[in-house]
């Protein structure tokens, strides 16, 4: 019997509340966008299967709450993640400055050697941009991690961000991960987490 996929990768989206993590996930998984996405409580996830270098890759993408009060809940989701996207808002300098704190969370909770990607979201809001591309790029380069600016609103680089992460994980894992191993890691179906009513736009 042919397997449904060759690889199963668990990805995690982390970053301050309001930077657009949920919107990035919606754009990539469902190709939809909403101006007023309600804040995530705890975690939510979506699944999308892609073709990568002739292989079928199933991406299970977890969207975590950025609020401090949920930090203890979401920290457990770092374990077992193959790749982690650290997202900031290019119009919010604080969210960029807090990237270092999020990277420390990865070091504390995630599996050693986990793939990382820095994502500057809301790149369409050029008139409000405060974090310059060159500054973020130099920071990412100093850490040896890839960097992309994205816009969930106009879909710019969203696909590229997740494909970059998937390709990196695949290269790191090589051919050692067979379907039998990865299927055992987690077996879930697409679903929606519970959200609260604090609304806020994300681009």
UniProtKB/Swiss-Prot annotation:
GO terms for molecular function: GTP binding; GTPase activity. GTP binds at residues 15-23, 33-40, 63-67, 121-124, 151-153. A lipid is attached at residues 202-203 (S-geranylgeranyl cysteine). Keywords: Autophagy, Cytoplasm, Endoplasmic reticulum, Golgi apparatus, GTP-binding, Lipoprotein, Membrane, Nucleotide-binding, Prenylation, Protein transport, Transport. It is found in: Endoplasmic reticulum membrane; Golgi apparatus membrane; Cytoplasm; Preautophagosomal structure membrane. InterPro entries: P-loop_NTPase, Rab, Small_GTP-bd, Small_GTPase. It is a peripheral membrane protein; Lipid-anchor. A motif (Effector region) lies at residues 37-45. One of its GO terms (cellular component) is phagophore assembly site membrane. Residues 180-203 are annotated as: Disordered. Rab activation is generally mediated by a guanine exchange factor (GEF), while inactivation through hydrolysis of bound GTP is catalyzed by a GTPase activating protein (GAP). It comes from the Eukaryota. GO terms for biological process: autophagosome assembly; intracellular protein transport. Its main location: endoplasmic reticulum. Disulfide bonds: none annotated. Belongs to the small GTPase superfamily. Rab family. The small GTPases Rab are key regulators of intracellular membrane trafficking, from the formation of transport vesicles to their fusion with membranes. Rabs cycle between an inactive GDP-bound form and an active GTP-bound form that is able to recruit to membranes different set of downstream effectors directly responsible for vesicle formation, movement, tethering and fusion. Ypt-1 regulates the trafficking of secretory vesicles from the endoplasmic reticulum (ER) to the Golgi. This is GTP-binding protein ypt1. The lineage of its organism: Eukaryota, Fungi, Dikarya, Ascomycota, Pezizomycotina.
């Amino acid at each position: 019997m042919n397997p449904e996929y060759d690889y199963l990768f668990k990805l995690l989206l982390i970053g301050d509340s309001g930077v657009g993590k949920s919107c990035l996930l919606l754009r990539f998984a469902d190709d939809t966008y909403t101006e007023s996405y309600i804040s995530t409580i705890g975690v939510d996830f979506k699944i999308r299967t892609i073709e990568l270098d002739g292989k079928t890759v199933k991406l299970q993408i977890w969207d975590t709450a950025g609020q401090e009060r949920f930090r203890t809940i979401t920290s457990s989701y770092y374990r077992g993640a193959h790749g982690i996207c650290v997202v900031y808002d290019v119009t919010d300098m604080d969210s960029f400055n807090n990237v270092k704190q999020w990277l420390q969370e990865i070091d504390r909770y995630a599996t050693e050697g986990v793939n990382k990607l820095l994502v500057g979201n809301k790149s369409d809001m050029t008139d409000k941009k405060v974090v310059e591309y060159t500054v973020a790029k130099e920071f990412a380069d100093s850490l040896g991690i890839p960097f992309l600016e994205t816009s969930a609103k106009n879909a710019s680089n969203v696909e590229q961000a997740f494909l970059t992460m998937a390709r990196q994980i695949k290269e790191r894992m090589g051919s050692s991960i067979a379907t039998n191993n990865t299927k055992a890691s987690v077996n879930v179906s697409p679903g929606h987490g519970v959200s609260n009513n604090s609304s806020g736009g994300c681009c």
